[in-house]
Amino acid sequence: MEPVDPRLEPWKHPGSQPKTACTTCYCKKCCFHCQVCFTTKALGISYGRKKRRQRRRPPQGSQTHQVSLSKQPTSQPRGDPTGPKE
């Protein structure tokens, strides 16, 4: 192994960067391209911010659902309507 200039930052050492740029392809060759590609593509690990999912807004005419609930009959009491016997 050849000596490395100690003044160089570790990420600038020869051999630390792949010769080709990373791509968005998920084939086997590209998944094993470099350590970053392996962790993100092959293992599916990403430490970036997660995108917030937007809640689906109901359509503008959604008031009919609320109206239909109020038109439903009230629940009927179950059991003996005269009450408990003593």
From Swiss-Prot:
Effect of substituting residue 77 to S: In strain: Clone pNL4-3
Compositional bias segments (type: Basic residues): 48-58
Region (Cysteine-rich) residue spans: 22-37
Polar residues composition-biased segments: 62-77
MF terms (GO), sorted A to Z: actinin binding; cyclin binding; metal ion binding; protein domain specific binding; protein serine/threonine phosphatase inhibitor activity; regulatory region RNA binding; RNA-binding transcription regulator activity; trans-activation response element binding
Keyword Oxidoreductase applies: no
Site, as annotated: Essential for Tat translocation through the endosomal membrane: 11
Primary location: host cell
Subunit organization: Interacts with host CCNT1. Associates with the P-TEFb complex composed at least of Tat, P-TEFb (CDK9 and CCNT1), TAR RNA, RNA Pol II. Recruits the HATs CREBBP, TAF1/TFIID, EP300, PCAF and GCN5L2. Interacts with host KAT5/Tip60; this interaction targets the latter to degradation. Interacts with the host deacetylase SIRT1. Interacts with host capping enzyme RNGTT; this interaction stimulates RNGTT. Binds to host KDR, and to the host integrins ITGAV/ITGB3 and ITGA5/ITGB1. Interacts with host KPNB1/importin beta-1 without previous binding to KPNA1/importin alpha-1. Interacts with EIF2AK2.
Misc. remarks from the entry: The infectious clone pNL4-3 is a chimeric provirus that consists of DNA from HIV isolates NY5 (5' half) and BRU (3' half).
Designated name of the protein: Protein Tat
Species whose genome carries this gene: Human immunodeficiency virus type 1 group M subtype B (isolate BRU/LAI)
Gene: tat
